[in-house]
């Protein structure tokens, strides 16, 4: 006679399920904030590295332009900004205005012989962004061309296009970059040579006036 084997396997009881779910909830409450913080730090570090590459490209373009056309810097260096509470005058300023215009039309005649346009054109080349169709960055995605004193969301919007960025470069009459703002994906990087680079969620770009 065949005996029925006793099946000792059984599912979780309601109490056991509640205990398991409680443990999962506790672990999630501990791990999710840490994971979110890690992701945010990784994003910020990646943007800082991008901004550093942009600073290198900008300084290279600046040095080349100054070596060839030093006289072109005189008229272009008419702007002011404030860094760490200190007002700095007689600076050149390159923004999305020039970058976007040249990205759209490389033969744009506005301020054609100024240092800002010469530098902007070279910066676009170094950043692989001279042609909109294959550009790494897009500078003409908004009609709001004034980059100074703006948060990332104010300038780019809360849902910016993937390649849309804010770029603001300040430089001296002798071709030295003194500050850069780089806005992307809701963050604002401020890079000032000799100081710690910052990356702030919806941070604000440096102010400026002429």
Label every model-predicted segment.
Residues 76-163, 206:
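Surface-exposed intrinsically disordered loops and tails
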Residues 144-210:
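Short, surface-exposed interaction loops/tails
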Residues 56-81:
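Alpha-helix exit/C-cap motif
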Residues 34-55, 65:
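Aliphatic-rich helix starts adjacent to a transmembrane/signal segment
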Residues 1-12:
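N-terminal leader/signal peptides at the extreme start of proteins
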Residues 3, 29, 44:
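Short, conserved catalytic or interaction motifs in soluble domains
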Residues 18-34:
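Alpha-helical hydrophobic helix detector
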């Amino acid at each position: 006679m065949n005996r029925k084997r006793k099946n000792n396997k059984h599912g979780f009881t309601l109490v056991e399920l509640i205990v398991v779910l409680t443990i999962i909830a506790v672990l999630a409450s501990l791990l999710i904030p840490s994971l979110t913080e890690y992701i945010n730090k990784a994003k910020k570090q990646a943007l800082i590295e991008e901004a550093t590459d942009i600073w290198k490209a900008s300084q290279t373009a600046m040095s080349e332009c100054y070596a060839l056309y030093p006289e072109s810097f005189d008229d272009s260096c008419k702007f002011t900004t404030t860094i760490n509470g200190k007002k700095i005058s007689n600076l050149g300023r390159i923004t999305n205005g020039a970058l976007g215009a040249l990205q759209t039309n490389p033969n744009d005649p506005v301020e054609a012989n100024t240092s800002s346009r010469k530098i902007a054109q070279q910066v676009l080349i170094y950043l692989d962004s001279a042609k909109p169709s294959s550009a790494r960055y897009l500078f003409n995605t908004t009609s709001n061309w004034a980059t100074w004193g703006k948060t990332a969301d104010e300038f780019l919007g809360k849902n910016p296009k993937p390649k849309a960025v804010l770029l603001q470069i300040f430089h001296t009459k002798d071709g030295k970059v003194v500050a850069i703002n780089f806005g992307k994906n809701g963050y604002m990087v401020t890079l000032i040579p000799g100081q710690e680079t910052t990356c702030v969620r919806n941070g604000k770009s440096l102010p400026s006036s002429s």
